[in-house]
Regions:
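Active-site-adjacent structural elements that line small-molecule/cofactor binding pockets in enzymes
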Residues: 1-203
Length: 203
């Protein structure tokens, strides 16, 4: 069994980096940064907790890649409604290059309502969110694997799109899908993912 480090992005950068160095020094397997923009809070009137500093995940991962030289790194997981899949693929390829081939792309349907509302992203219905996840996974996988990608989907459209760098020294960047919904998520995992993240308990 491998052990990884999943820090909160609501802590100061110096503390997060110290935790990453400690994880690497102990031989841990990976560092996973949560992909959120603010503290989770009830939707409605603005909550004071939303003003607490929260580090953006991909910027944080790039810094970790440069300063922590061995462990795997990735977002756990990147909500597909936050960024266009082509942007995610481009960031993943760049992160893999910076890190010398240690990046993992984590994707999920997205769930935190307050950040979607505050930034005007729109969560959509349950089926829409999982349709978007399915299209995003297929698009990111193709962008990282193929020379050019064309997609005419309901949520993703690409026209002969390239994505370079797409993996350090020809590496195939692993795609991780987060979630445990039996009707949609598991099918998406089976079709597209190299790895699967879920919440689970021994019992």
């Amino acid at each position: 069994m491998d052990v990884s480090f999943w820090p909160t992005s609501a802590q100061p950068w110096a503390d997060l980096l110290a935790g990453c160095h400690a994880a690497e020094a102990r031989g841990w397997h990976g560092i996973w940064v949560p992909d959120h923009f603010m503290t989770n809070a009830p939707v409605g009137a603005p909550d004071p907790s939303e003003l607490h500093p929260w580090l953006e995940s991909w910027t944080t991962l790039a810094a970790v890649a440069a300063l922590v030289p061995r462990v795997r790194i990735g977002a756990m997981v990147c909500g597909v409604g936050y960024r266009h899949p082509a942007v995610v693929a481009k960031m993943a390829g760049t992160l893999d290059e910076i890190s010398g081939g240690r990046a993992v792309v984590g994707l999920g349907a997205g769930w935190q309502e307050n950040e979607h509302r505050r930034y005007g992203l729109g969560t959509g219905t349950g089926p829409e969110r999982f349709d978007r996840l399915e299209e995003a996974c297929a698009a990111v996988r193709s962008l990282l694997d193929e020379e050019r990608t064309t997609v005419e989907g309901d949520h993703v459209r690409l026209d002969a799109a390239p994505c370079e760098p797409s993996g350090h020294a020809g590496r195939r960047i692993p795609l991780l899908v987060g979630g445990r919904g039996p009707r949609r998520t598991l099918r998406t995992v089976a079709r597209h993912a190299d790895e699967w993240n879920l919440w689970a308990f021994p019992e």
